[in-house]
Amino acid sequence: MKERLITDSYDGYELRYPFLVEHVKTQLEKQFWTATEARVDLDEVEMLYALTDEQRNVVKRLLPLFLRYELYVGSFWTDTYAKLFPCPEAQEAAVTVAMVERAIHARFYDKINKAFGLDKDIHYLSYLDDPAFKGRAKWIGDLLKSDD
């Protein structure tokens, strides 16, 4: 029988890449946290009272990009990685990392956005109004979708 590669599609479930299963186990059992656990009330106080107007403006302009990056990275794991590595262990790793990026990290950044009153599409999409931020977001998106 030919040795199965990580890039081979496989309908069975025999474990061949235990390091991927260990990664998933570590993520879910030792590193797992949720956006609801993370407190942002002190961030809100710091934003209001400790930052200068200029610093506040920078934070407000960067937050939508952080959220966008989390969504791009989540999509990379399900749309690119999962297609390149169709073995069961890689599929499990892909959906786990994508879940962390989308359901935890992106939700955490959104929690910050809500605390700062930046939770409307006018804010979420504001990076598109800045050519540098728009270019950066496009570059990251393209990079994560590339064949390289």
Report the location of each language-model feature:
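Non-heme di-metal
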Residues: 1-148
